[in-house]
């Protein structure tokens, strides 16, 4: 099933309902959709949660009559060494977040020089990211694609 931002979906496992306001996709073929629940209390913002498309069923048109879903372009930077135009930081583009209401962000993984330390992740607005002119390393996303959706999804990126 194609998930369309702005529509309301229900998780078939938990019954959680919300409007799809974004998608996080990773280079290794994992996509999770962000559902923002409606609050019963005026001015209270509930926390969004992430779900896989196979977990979701369409409930209604949500706010799709008020907000047009963005056109999602191919992820041109996946697997490429990229540079943040603002800070000059280099990293491998491993994912992106696409929002219903604002610009997309690419996710760069910055590998520390000491490989015993954890990698750092930078979420950067798409306008800040450019491919490195002389990359030291690149990888075809097909080389790291998992057999099943969700392979390798880092738990620290969960929104709930």
Region locations from a protein language model:
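Basic/aromatic-rich interaction segments and small domains that mediate binding to polyanionic partners
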Residues: 2-4, 8-55, 72, 81, ...
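Intrinsically disordered, low-complexity, charged/polar segments
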Residues: 41-72, 113-160
